[in-house]
């Protein structure tokens, strides 16, 4: 399944994309009319949090089938053209990110490949698909992109052994880890350079892990104004998904809705000769196999 959060008519909701339809099933409305018992999560995060007691996907499937059988299916669907995409997990939880997890990317920035380089991104930096974000020219002329696979955590745990780590994964999404390279080079910590307003575009969907059975063998392609900048594969990750979860959970308790950004392949603007940073009016597209394309616009 592909889940998303969105705004429609000034109301925040969440839903599911079914098959090849260019519309979202509004699960807030579907559950209001067709939920089994008291299962009626008001947000996608609430659905993930209740997944340990009731199979969230199965409850969604049953409710959508009931809506289809009602003869009023169209009343519960909204065209993608009419919605504003929000970060898939809304309200947002923790975003924990790994840097230098692709050797070629570390090399292009002249960084040593370290065993563990972790930072967080502020919740206020999150935005959804098709968002227009500030160009931040008032503070930097080195705005950069990083296309990444995001892991969506599905259940709580800490000190999770590698052998069990994938049991804690609910699904995957796309992240563009927008970075102020100027601040990154001047500061000892990464939080500020990674937490600009609009600096964490995410989405458009969460794809459940059953629909992405080989997440460590998917292509990541980033285009700026239709020019391919990054063309990598998650198979190039230094720490694999189970290792990332094991490492983080040694120190941080993970909870449903937490997002782990797994690092970016080579091809960022700062690594080019000469560097090619994002400019006002640019369009950035990050595509990952079987998830979709995350589009971001830099304001003029």
Swiss-Prot record:
KW Amino-acid biosynthesis (keyword) present: no
S-S bonds: none
GO MF annotation list: acetylpyruvate hydrolase activity; metal ion binding
Record field: transmembrane: none
Pfam families cross-referenced by the UniProt entry: FAA_hydrolase
Entry keyword set: Metal-binding
InterPro entries registered for this protein in UniProt: Fumarylacetoacetase-like_C (IPR011234), Fumarylacetoacetase_C_sf (IPR036663)
Binding locations of a divalent metal cation: 146, 148, 177
Protein family: Belongs to the FAH family.
Record protein name field: Uncharacterized protein SAR0930
Organism: Staphylococcus aureus (strain MRSA252)
């Amino acid at each position: 399944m592909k889940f998303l959060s969105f705004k429609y008519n000034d109301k925040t909701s969440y839903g599911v994309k079914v098959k090849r339809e260019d519309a979202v099933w509004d699960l807030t409305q579907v559950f209001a009319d067709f939920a089994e018992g008291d299962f009626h999560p008001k947000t996608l995060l609430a659905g993930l949090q209740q997944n340990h007691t009731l199979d969230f996907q199965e409850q969604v499937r049953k409710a959508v089938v009931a809506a289809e059988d009602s003869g009023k299916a169209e009343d519960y669907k909204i065209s993608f053209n009419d919605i504003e995409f929000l970060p898939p997990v809304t309200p947002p939880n923790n975003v924990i990110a790994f840097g230098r997890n692709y050797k070629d990317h570390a090399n292009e920035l002249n960084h040593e490949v370290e065993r563990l380089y972790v930072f967080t991104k502020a919740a206020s930096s999150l935005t959804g698909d098709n968002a227009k974000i500030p160009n931040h020219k008032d503070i930097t002329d080195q705005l950069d992109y990083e296309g990444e696979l995001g892991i969506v955590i599905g259940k709580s745990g800490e000190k999770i052994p590698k052998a069990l780590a994938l049991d804690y994964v609910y699904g995957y999404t796309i992240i563009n880890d927008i970075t102020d390279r100027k601040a990154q080079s001047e500061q000892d910590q990464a939080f500020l350079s990674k937490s600009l307003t609009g600096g964490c575009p995410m989405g458009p969907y969460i794809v459940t892990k059953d629909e992405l059975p080989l997440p460590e063998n998917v292509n990541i392609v980033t285009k700026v104004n239709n020019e391919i900048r990054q063309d990598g594969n998650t198979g190039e990750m230094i720490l694999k998904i189970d290792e990332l979860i094991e490492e983080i959970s040694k120190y941080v308790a993970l909870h449903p809705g937490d997002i782990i950004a797994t690092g970016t392949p080579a091809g960022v603007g700062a690594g080019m000769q000469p560097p090619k940073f994002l400019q006002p009016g640019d369009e950035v597209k990050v595509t990952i196999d079987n998830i979709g394309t995350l589009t971001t616009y830099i304001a003029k």
